[in-house]
Amino acid sequence: FLPFLGISQSGKVMDNLSVVSKILGMERKYAVYLPPDYYTSERSYPVLYLLHGAGDDHTGWVQFGEVLQITDKAIADGKSTPMIIIMPDADTKVRGYFNSPDNAWKYEDFFFDELIPEVEKKFRIKASKRFRAVAGLSMGGGGSFMYALHRPDMFSAACPLSAYTGPLSMEAFKAQLANRSMAGTEAQLEAY
């Protein structure tokens, strides 16, 4: 008599992928989590865009957030549907998920116009609002909050965790920009 040996499938994480951005004029890295049945099925999956906090990069959720173990367990326990998770880098060259007020740095444009179309073509992602969510921590929480506000047509759910949403006054905003060596005209700052 041999005892039953339960062997569960594991998802896969690739943390050194990249997309060439014409908008940013550089290559941007990202990580992806693929569910356990990705390579044994032909189905398409919902997607979660998972944004890291300040001082981290696209590998943060992989290394410190244990995205592979936590997501595999949630799927195995029936608490989550199998999904693809995309974790983009927002800490190389300029930190943040937004366009700069003077539009010299257009990360938000890159995210919506280049990253999303690229990964939704590369992986079997259900490319519609109904199957797309965004979440993030701290700086990434701010990104997920603002992306949901700026583009409600894109996401069915948003989960900003301890979201940093920026300064509370125009004076504090200008001081923050000065500390980051960024600038903008009064009209650009007001519009931003």
Regions found by a protein language model. Give the residues of each.
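Bacterial Sec-dependent N-terminal signal peptides
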Residues: 1-11
